[in-house]
Every structure is written in structure tokens, then in C-alpha cells.
Amino acid sequence: MKDTLFNQSLNKRFCFDEKVAHVFDDMLERSIPYYYEMLDLGAYFIAQNLKENLNAKPLIYDLGCSTGNFFIALNRQIQQEIELVGIDNSMPMLKKAQEKLKDFNNVRFECMDFLEVEFKEASAFSLLFVLQFVRPMQREVLLKKIYNSLALNGVLLVGEKIMSEDRILDKQMIELYYLYKQNQGYSHNEIAFKREALENVLVPYSLKENIALLESVGFKHVEAVFKWVNFTLLVARKT
């Protein structure tokens, strides 16, 4: 279903309710440059890591899994038996995910606040365009919890919208991103109304800040494997 949610001002903060869930896949594809390519790229690195670590724990968590797109990408690339657990606090999103992945018997979804979940030991975690919605004071706590739950040689994927530390560059990057959204069919009003709804809800860090945060909780190897202007995909390994 086409995203027309912001044809007019919502007069409220953005939240992942039923209206958003109905159009979320279209919103993702038109709002995040190379969205599906990043999912495939992330799935590749997890699949390769599992191949090279034969004793890897057969469990992967996707936190803030929304409509389950990443698990579709993972199931295309992972050959061995693996348990996929998606956690999201939006039941409308999870209903969409369950519909899309009803034919996969290795997928389980839980409607919970992932900040309160006690994770089992896992071979991989993913936070794909999710950390930016976590309150800054809680991000380090969450990442430390993930790090402690990762098996040795496990990986964490972090996809994020980012900002530049240079004020002028940041303004230019945002302007280019808005041009991208216009080319995807969004009007000036839709872009402005969505920006208004996301203010103080989506709080981006710079690339350096995200990498420093990951390193501060224990990750020794953090790599930006993809970047387009103000979007990036990071792979962090626990060694």
C-alpha cells in the first residue's frame, strides 16, 4: 500500500501504529536509499560468519523487526538450520510480519520492549534503523546488553540514519536527501510534515559517534560496509 500518511500534518509525534504498519514497507523503500540492498548486504555478512564459525549458536535476533523484511533476506542466504527471533513493541507491525513469513517455520516474533528482554546467547543481532529511535541515554545500556549476549565471533548489524559533525555538510546532506525523497514521489508538504512528526523521536548520531559507542561497550572491530550520504550500515564483531 502506498504511503500517503503525511499528506497532511498528523498533529502528533510519530509512532508505529496501525496506520503506519499498513504503509510501512512502501515508506521504507521510498525513504531509505538502497534499503533492500542493505538488507541483503547485512544478511550476507551474517551468513558468511555462520559458515566460518561452525560452532556458532543457531540463534539470531532482529530487534525492532517491524514487518520482518530482514528475515526474508536472511532465509535467502542462510543454508543451515537457524532460529530467528524478531522483537518489536508494535503489534500492528508484527501482524504484518507474521502474514509475510507464515511459511517459514524457523521464525518467531515477540511483542515486547527489547530494552527489557533477557536475551539468550546468539550468533548475531540486528538493529536496522532502530537505534536512532532509542533514547540516547539508553543506547549504551542496550548495546552492552547485546554485546554480553553475543557469542564469541558473533556479529551485530547496525543500520542508521546519521548526521555530519560539520554544520554546513550536514545541511547539504539533508537537502540532498530531501531531493531523493522528492524523486521517490513525496511532496514538499509530505516531507515537511514527516520531519515535524519525527522531531525528537528520531535522534541521529554521527558515524564517528556510532562507532565510538559500539567500541565503548566492547566491540574491537567495527566497519562501515555501506554508506550513502546520511545512511550507513555498520558491522561490529565480538572477538
Curated annotation (Swiss-Prot):
Example GO biological process: tRNA wobble uridine modification
Source organism superkingdom: Bacteria
Keyword Transcription set for record: no
GO molecular function: carboxyl- or carbamoyltransferase activity; S-adenosyl-L-methionine binding
EC supergroup of this enzyme: transferase
Reaction catalysed by this enzyme: prephenate + S-adenosyl-L-methionine = carboxy-S-adenosyl-L-methionine + 3-phenylpyruvate + H2O
Transferase found in the keyword field: yes
Binding-site residues, S-adenosyl-L-methionine: 35, 64-66, 88-89, 195
Cysteine disulfide partners in this protein: none
Enzyme Commission number(s) from the entry: 2.1.3.-
Keywords: S-adenosyl-L-methionine, Transferase
Family named by the database record: Belongs to the class I-like SAM-binding methyltransferase superfamily. Cx-SAM synthase family.
Assembly with partners or alone: Homodimer.
Function: Catalyzes the conversion of S-adenosyl-L-methionine (SAM) to carboxy-S-adenosyl-L-methionine (Cx-SAM).
Protein name: Carboxy-S-adenosyl-L-methionine synthase
